[in-house]
């Protein structure tokens, strides 16, 4: 049997789809092999050629299982450590999550085969990027969304990184799909022109890396200290460990008071209700002010509801030691808007909470803050804030960005995911936000990766994971507005709409030619 005939078998293509999907994980941190993104997408597009809609749909699902099964397996760490369920059930839950995310790649492959059954250039170079943009949007929106593992992030160190300040991560993903499609067309139809165009799309954006969309302000450079407490997740919400936790952060902070005007503690560094820590917060506020430093810290806010309706809890950031003396409730604060299902709130709460510890984790009853909130002000600087998972949401970060923003800030606690690849992927996505908006980004975490990122997405300084130490770094604020900061995703959606209309025209004309 020839290799060509062997590759026509559906089960062979399904297995290859799993392989090519898994290859895509190598494009992301900590591996950072950006060409793997093109290889993975090339595999998806080539394997769905000459397939019926049903066959292509299954291949798309298998490819998604390869990508998400390997790329988000870090979810298993938190489920197994804190979910309180048998190993078999933990594995099944991770498979179910990967299967759910694979529904979107399945939808992509099915629509592509249905609308464009022939291996034409417009199917591979135009229809594929358009449909991918649409299905990726759905993945980031349906059921609150999970826009993890977008291929554009793989280019943070790649040749297409210069696209980010123009069109954001979606624009990079769009071009990657077009390049992959052209390469498939070049191989399948033996058209050297398609390969040349693909190479041009890959290399022509390279000079864009040299454009500086921002203006540094070296005269305003400031020393910043970010404290990495390395508190074990098992101790995080233990009332018996509260005093020890606060003492760790205070002891690590003292040497930098008066030395660093801005000191940052990570997400829920103070693992208690804000009003219950009034004495401690007042003491820290006075201590900071006396030493001419200011502190940003994560904490839990509880707001009493009227008419005996209890409290609303918020995952918040507050500022201490700045211009105004601390007195609850301060106005200089940020409350997390995009909450993580099961981690910060539980859907169908009354039904699911009794079933297993996974659905009844500590502090999993948060409420949303406003979608758009004013920047934090500290030591004369404006910071656009995002807590943990929110830094993945490019549109939300952009919508909160202001022309007067000096720094981006994200605080996080990735202790849930242990020594897995999850924190590295999270870190990579944070770097993209700095590149898109042309601002330095300060990332303070409980156990890593704590880092300062430059306005071009470069790593200025970082400290190792799973260590208790402080990152001290001098960071220069920037001004200026990138095209992406000014226009957001609108240019990308206009491109998608125009090329989508062209795709529909070609599909309708192709069907009429048949008849």
From Swiss-Prot:
Matching PROSITE patterns: CN_HYDROLASE
GO cellular component: plasma membrane
InterPro entries the record matches: Apolipo_AcylTrfase, C-N_Hydrolase, C-N_Hydrolase_sf, LNT_N
Domain CN hydrolase: 227-477
Residue numbers annotated as active site: 267, 336, 388
GO molecular function: N-acyltransferase activity
Enzyme type, top EC level: transferase
E.C. number(s) listed in UniProt: 2.3.1.269
Topology class, membrane: Multi-pass membrane protein
HAMAP family: Lnt
Family note: Belongs to the CN hydrolase family. Apolipoprotein N-acyltransferase subfamily.
Protein name per its UniProtKB record: Apolipoprotein N-acyltransferase
